[in-house]
Each structure stands twice: as structure tokens, then as C-alpha cells.
């Protein structure tokens, strides 16, 4: 409804404005000491002792941020602008979510497990990350070339992206635990 009434840009500005009002309400009305923790001794306490965990955490922030931008704003707007009805867009996103979960559950069967828990898994994470980086670039080229049946080509590309993303996410989750070792 918001897109139909205000359009895309104005809708984003309206949502940003409403979130700003919520933030202002939190600042004004939430008690000052609520949720306040003890001051940390240094900024180093925010990070794990293991560099692998810190790198994976940074990668996950970027991965999930990219996924959320695509699937909260970009994909629904693209599909709706391509003539898909709301139920079709919602159905696609529902199937996407179910498929994503199925791939994540199957991911341990795709990545061979090594005795040390890292020697096979780290290269696998690099491989799946590279694939994940290539797919959006390929999709951008396809959109630029304006191929016939563009929305279906994009949907297929998003399927490949989702598959790679789900495997990547699963491998990253495993590696965080593997790197943590006794810190679990």
C-alpha cells in the first residue's frame, strides 16, 4: 500500500522518518540506566581472541546485510514492478525462505568434514564465498543487458544466490564453533 500511495523513494523516506520518531521516543522515554552494563576495560573486549572468529563475524555482518537489502526491499519491488501480484511476490518469498532452510539443513552433506574441523571447511567457505560474490555481478550484467523474460532470469539467479548463501551461512556457523574450540 505504501508503495502505491507514495512511490518507492518516498516510501523509504517515510519509513526512515517513522524509525527516527521511534528512536526519539526511546531516547526521551526509556529510563537512562535501563540496559546499562558495566563499562568495559578496553575495546579489545568486544572482539574474540581468535582472528578467525572476528573475520567470520565481519563476513556474516556483510552477508546478512546484503541479503536483507535484497530480500526486504530490492526483490519485492523488482518483482512487483515486473507485474507480479502481491500474492505471487509473497509466495516467492515464502518458498525462498523454505528452500533456504532446506539447503542450510543439507549443507553439511555438501562440505566434506575434515578430522581437524578446519582444513577442508575453510577452503570450502572461500569457494562458496567466491560463488556468492560472482552471482550478483552476473545478475547485474543480465539486468544491464535487458535480456528477454528478465524477471524469470533474475528469479533463477536468485535461486543460485540463495543456494550459495545458505551453504555459506551454514559453513560460517560451523566455522565459528570450530574456531571457538574451548571458548564455546
Task: Describe these PLM feature segments.
Residues 10-13, 80-99, 121-128, 152-153:
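Loop-to-transmembrane helix entry
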Amino acid at each position: 500500500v505504501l508503495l502505491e500511495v507514495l512511490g518507492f523513494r518516498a516510501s523509504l523516506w517515510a519509513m526512515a522518518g517513522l524509525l527516527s520518531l521511534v528512536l526519539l521516543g526511546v531516547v526521551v522515554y526509556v529510563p537512562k540506566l535501563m540496559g546499562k552494563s558495566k563499562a568495559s576495560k578496553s575495546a579489545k573486549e568486544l572482539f574474540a581472541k581468535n582472528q578467525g572468529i572476528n573475520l567470520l563475524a565481519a563476513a556474516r555482518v556483510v552477508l546478512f546485510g546484503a541479503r536483507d537489502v535484497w530480500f526486504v526491499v530490492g526483490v519485492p519491488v523488482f518483482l512487483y514492478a515486473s507485474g507480479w501480484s502481491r500474492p505471487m511476490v509473497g509466495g516467492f518469498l515464502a518458498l525462498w525462505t523454505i528452500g533456504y532452510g532446506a539447503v542450510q539443513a543439507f549443507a553439511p552433506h555438501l562440505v566434506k568434514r575434515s578430522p581437524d574441523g578446519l582444513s577442508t571447511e575453510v577452503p570450502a567457505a572461500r569457494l562458496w564465498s567466491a560463488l556468492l560474490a560472482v552471482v550478483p555481478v552476473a545478475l547485474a550484467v543480465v539486468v544491464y543487458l535487458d535480456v528477454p523474460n528478465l524477471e524469470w532470469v533474475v528469479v533463477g539467479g536468485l535461486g543460485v544466490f540463495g543456494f550459495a548463501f545458505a551453504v555459506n551461512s551454514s559453513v560460517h556457523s560451523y566455522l565459528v564453533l570450530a574456531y571457538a574450540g574451548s571458548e564455546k
